[in-house]
């Protein structure tokens, strides 16, 4: 087997190999080598024979080869493994292998020579693993003691010996003590048998020499001794020059050097001994092994000892640190104690000062307390005095009020002022109903405002949710468009940079076609978002938002309708709401445009998809490399067109076309939300102000009505003057009376207008609210559902009756008919009831002319009555009288057989001088009198029948109650009987089941007996 030469270390001649060996320093094995030999190397010419004296000074060739073969070993050629049947060429090795190594049996005897080779990697068997202190960058740092089997070597860095450390990751999270360190150590050499030779390699696949088995001379032993002395001397000089960071560094440095030298000398000595006697060499090798093991044990003991030493040193260092920290803490505490003492002294002074101030304040407080007690006594005395005065005043007021009340009753009875009482009751009823409806209106406004805030908040949440959905859809669409655009730009650049018509573009265009189809699929999905179910769901959400907005807008309109001004004008918040609704409609319009794609998406996306489809079709039908350049230009134009479309779509994302006058969504939406918030605040203020204003107007009307009634009573009661009173005073009192009546009339007209306006306004505000409440109560089958509606009518009736009573009183005082409200106003106030109320006034107006004509007849009759009163009456018969209720609700009396009022009409009718219209009126009146008598008779008969029917109904109700009680008792008894029967049936069934079980058990017991 031929061995090729290694390129790094050619070994084709003996001279070159020797020169290489002399150049190699022994430091690779841990020493500096022999300086004398290095100096003499350049002076000797190996080509010539040397004298014997000079030859004795050189190391023998075999010794030098055995010492330096490890350093000069070259890598083993790969063609040697596995071995081939080729002869090894000459000149590959420095010398021939001895014959003893070619025989496996004999080679095993000398195996100890190759089991312990010399190592240059620092894996020698020394005690350098004790080295635990590193010295890096001028700092000494202790390391954990490593076990001996790791066999860490020592390396020299700038004169400082540091342990070899394997490469580790600097950014690792694993602590250093858990890192795995691998070291191959010193392994034995391996032999490979060839057909023509035997090779020796180490663990690094380097080709080594077998130890020489030639006989040795005494000169070689002497020269080996000189080499050892020289190497030890050189090592001692280096050790003196070396200064490590610690003593352990220096000790380990010496041990490393010496052990390396001893290892080399031992190896050569064992070889020399083995040449003469193999057994003696083997024994010496065993002694060497034992020696190494002994050193290893000593090293282990030193490790334990050194661990204890290092631990104690660390503990001492920690104790020193703790002592230093303790001392530092004591200093800090002492300093703080001084500060606390100073602060304590300061606080003591401040406390003494505060104590003095407090004592002075206590003295002042005692003085002030005495003064306060005196003031309190004065206050109690004054309060008792005032309470006594108040009691006296209250007693006097009660006496005068009771006397005034009794006098008022007597005056009312004497002067028949019954209508004043009805005026007071009407005012009281009107005030009660007005307060009730103001409170009801305030509660309804509060509920509507709370509901309005809730609905607007829900509407805002839905709008924000819709905005997020639309923005997410637009963002995903824009990202997709960016991906498509980037892909188009990438492929277009690729096509423009390289030759697209080359024959090796087939695979590339397949990937392009896949990308185009994928983009087409994605864009179709985005197109479906603007049509179909997605669009319908967005429209449904928008419809819900619109419906919710209409609801809170209707509630706002209801509030505004209840809070109109007295003139019927809507509040300013109504216009503000209309402005909000206009902006909301703009927002809806913009959302619709963005949802359905009218901003350009729905038009550009289909054209973009068709362009992609066209490009895909072209790429599928292209034939390489025979495709004409025109088709590629057409595809390139389509790509440019698609890029422009994509740019337009990306610019349209989140906006609408410029020709539509719509603001940005975010700005417009924030503006609308702010307007709604301000609108709600304004509505709350309007509600509070409106209710306060209603209450204020009611109080003013209440006081004005009472004041007018008091003034009326004062004027209605006549002034009684003495006979001795002067005429001037009577004239002055009559003038004052006329002025008071005129002022009372003016006040009544003004008060009537205000009362009519306020009552109409309040009833119009509450009408819709009360109707809705009545409907909701009726649907829930609530009792008295229409009670509030009746109270609204009662409010209007009380207002009308007060005004009507006021007009009656003024008419009686003035002596002529006074109307405070027109027919249209009454119709607006009472609606359908005004016609019934105005039947009698219309009839009175039709007979005004008749009354004027009959005034003269009445005057004549009065004159006749006065004459009759002047003449003494001789008749003892009493005149029969009839009592009737007048318009003022007072009881009046008149003679039963009064002179006929229509006698003048009848006389003139007999004479034929009466006009035709009066004849018709007389006929109508007589007919009406007859009908009235008939109606009165029927009414009396109906009343009698009603009383009889009512008594019968009362008796039947009593009988029904008795019958119901009997029915209830009978039902209870029947239920109890049914329950008893059910219990009996259940018991009977249980007894029957028990009997059947007993019978079945007896039958089962009899059946086995029959079997026997």
Swiss-Prot record:
Entry-linked InterPro entries: Axonemal_dynein_LC_domain, Axonemal_dynein_light_chain
Consequence when changing residue 95 to C: Found in non-obstructive azoospermia in one patient; uncertain significance
Stretches for region Disordered: 1-34, 841-879, 963-1012
Keyword Transmembrane: no
Annotated Acidic residues bias: 841-854, 988-997
Annotated compartments: Cytoplasm
Effect after changing residue 593 to R: Found in non-obstructive azoospermia in one patient; uncertain significance
Keyword Membrane: no
Family matches, as Pfam families: Ax_dynein_light
UniProt feature, compositional bias: Low complexity: 1-17
Compositionally biased region (Basic and acidic residues): 855-879, 963-987
CC terms in the record's Gene Ontology section: ciliary basal body; cilium; cytoplasm; cytosol
Coiled coil spans: 317-402, 447-486, 572-597
Tissue specificity note: Highly expressed in testis. Highly expressed in the round and late spermatids.
Clinical condition linked: Defects in this gene may be a cause of male infertility.
Name of this protein: Axonemal dynein light chain domain-containing protein 1
Organism: Homo sapiens
Gene: AXDND1
């Amino acid at each position: 087997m031929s061995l090729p030469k290694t390129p790094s270390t050619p070994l084709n001649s003996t001279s070159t190999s020797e020169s290489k060996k002399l150049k190699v320093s022994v430091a690779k094995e841990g020493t500096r080598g022999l300086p004398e030999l290095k100096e003499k190397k350049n002076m000797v010419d190996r080509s010539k024979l040397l004298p014997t004296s000079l030859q004795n000074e050189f190391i023998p060739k075999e010794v030098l080869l055995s010492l330096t073969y490890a350093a000069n070993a070259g890598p083993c050629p790969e063609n040697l493994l596995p071995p081939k049947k080729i002869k090894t060429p000459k000149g590959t090795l420095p010398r021939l292998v001895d014959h003893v190594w070619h025989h496996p049996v004999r080679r095993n005897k000398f195996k100890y020579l190759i089991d312990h080779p010399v190592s240059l990697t620092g894996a020698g068997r020394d005690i350098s693993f004790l080295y635990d202190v590193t010295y890096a960058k001028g700092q000494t740092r202790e390391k954990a003691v490593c076990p001996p089997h790791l066999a860490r070597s020592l390396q020299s860095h700038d004169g400082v010996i540091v342990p070899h450390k394997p490469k580790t990751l600097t950014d690792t999270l694993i602590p250093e003590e858990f890192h795995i360190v691998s070291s191959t150590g010193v392994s034995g050499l391996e032999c490979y048998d060839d057909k023509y030779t035997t090779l020796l390699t180490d663990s690094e696949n380097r080709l080594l020499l077998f130890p020489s088995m030639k006989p040795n001379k005494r000169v070689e032993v002497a020269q080996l001794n000189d080499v050892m002395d020289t190497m030890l001397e050189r090592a001692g000089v280096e050790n003196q020059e070396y200064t490590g960071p610690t003593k352990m560094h220096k000790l380990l440095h010496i041990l490393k050097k010496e052990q390396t030298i001893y290892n080399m000398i031992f190896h050569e000595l064992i070889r020399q001994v083995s040449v003469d006697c193999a057994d003696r060499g083997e024994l010496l090798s065993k002694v060497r092994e034992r020696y190494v093991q002994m050193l290893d044990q000593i090293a282990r003991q030193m490790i334990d000892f050194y661990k204890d030493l290092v631990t104690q040193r660390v503990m001492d260092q920690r104790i020193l640190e703790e002592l230093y920290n303790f001392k530092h803490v004591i200093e800090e505490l002492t300093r703080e104690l001084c500060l606390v003492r100073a602060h304590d002294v300061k606080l003591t002074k401040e406390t003494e000062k505060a104590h003095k101030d407090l004592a002075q304040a206590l003295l002042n407080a005692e003085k002030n307390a005495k003064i306060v007690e005196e003031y309190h006594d004065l206050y109690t005395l004054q309060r008792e005095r005032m309470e006594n005065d108040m009691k006296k005043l209250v007693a006097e007021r009660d006496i005068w009020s009771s006397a005034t009340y009794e006098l008022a009753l007597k005056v009312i009875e004497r002067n028949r002022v019954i209508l004043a009482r009805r005026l007071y009751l009407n005012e009281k009823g009107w005030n009660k109903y007005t307060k009730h409806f103001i409170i009801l209106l305030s509660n309804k406004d509060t509920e509507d405002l709370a509901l309005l805030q809730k609905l607007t908040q829900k509407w805002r949440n839905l709008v924000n949710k819709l905005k997020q959905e639309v923005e997410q859809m637009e963002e995903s669409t824009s990202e997709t468009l960016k991906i498509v655009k980037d892909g188009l730009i990438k492929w277009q650049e690729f096509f423009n940079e390289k030759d697209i018509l080359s024959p090796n573009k087939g695979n590339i265009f397949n990937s392009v076609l896949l990308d185009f189809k994928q983009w087409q699929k994605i864009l179709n999905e985005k197109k479906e978002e603007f049509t179909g179910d997605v669009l319908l769901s967005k429209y449904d959400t928008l419809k819900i938002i619109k419906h919710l907005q209409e609801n809170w807008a209707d509630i706002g309109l209801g509030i505004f309708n209840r809070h109109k001004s007295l003139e019927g004008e809507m509040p300013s918040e109504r216009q503000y709401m209309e402005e909000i609704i206009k902006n909301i409609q703009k927002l809806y319009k913009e959302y619709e445009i963005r949802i359905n794609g009218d901003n350009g998406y729905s038009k550009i996306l289909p054209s973009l998809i068709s362009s992609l489809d066209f490009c895909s079709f072209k790429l599928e039908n292209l034939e390489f490399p025979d495709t004409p350049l025109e088709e590629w230009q057409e595809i390139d134009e389509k790509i440019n067109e698609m890029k422009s479309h994509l740019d337009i779509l990306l610019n349209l994302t989140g906006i609408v076309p410029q020709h539509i006058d719509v603001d940005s969504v975010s700005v417009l939406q924030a503006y609308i939300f702010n307007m709604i918030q301000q609108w709600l605040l304004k509505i709350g203020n309007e509600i509070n102000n409106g209710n306060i204003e209603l209450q204020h107007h009611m109080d003013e009307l209440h006081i004005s009505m009472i004041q007018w009634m008091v003034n009326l009573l004062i004027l209605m009661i006549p002034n009684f003057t003495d006979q001795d009173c002067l005429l001037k005073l009577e004239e002055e009192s009559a003038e004052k009376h006329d002025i008071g009546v005129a002022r009372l009339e003016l006040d009544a007209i003004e008060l009537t207008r205000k009362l009519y306006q306020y009552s109409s306004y309040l009833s119009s505000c509450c009408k819709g609210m009360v109707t809705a409440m009545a409907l909701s109560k009726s649907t829930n089958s609530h009792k008295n559902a229409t009670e509030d509606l009746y109270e609204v009518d009662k409010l209007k009736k009380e207002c009308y009756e007060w005004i009507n009573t006021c007009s009656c009183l003024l008419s009686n005082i003035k002596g002529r008919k006074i109307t405070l409200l027109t027919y249209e106003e009454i119709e607006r106030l009472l609606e359908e009831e005004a016609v019934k109320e105005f039947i009698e006034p219309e009839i009175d107006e039709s007979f005004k002319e008749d009354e004027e004509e009959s005034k003269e007849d009445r005057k004549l009759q009065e004159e006749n009555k006065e004459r009759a009163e002047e003449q003494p009456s001789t008749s003892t018969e009493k005149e029969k009288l009839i009592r009737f209720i007048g318009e003022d609700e007072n009881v009046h009396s008149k003679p039963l057989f009064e002179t006929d009022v229509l006698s003048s009409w009848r006389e003139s009718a007999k004479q034929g001088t009466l006009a035709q219209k009066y004849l018709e009126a007389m006929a109508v009146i007589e007919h009406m009198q007859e009908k009235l008598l008939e109606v009165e008779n029927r009414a009396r008969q109906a009343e009698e029948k009603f009383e009889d029917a009512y008594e019968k109904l009362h008796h039947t109700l009593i009988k029904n109650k008795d019958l119901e009680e009997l029915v209830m008792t009978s039902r209870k008894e029947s239920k109890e009987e049914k329950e008893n029967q059910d219990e009996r049936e259940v018991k009977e069934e249980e007894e029957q089941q028990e009997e059947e079980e007993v019978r079945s058990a007896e039958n089962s017991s009899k059946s086995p007996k029959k079997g026997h």
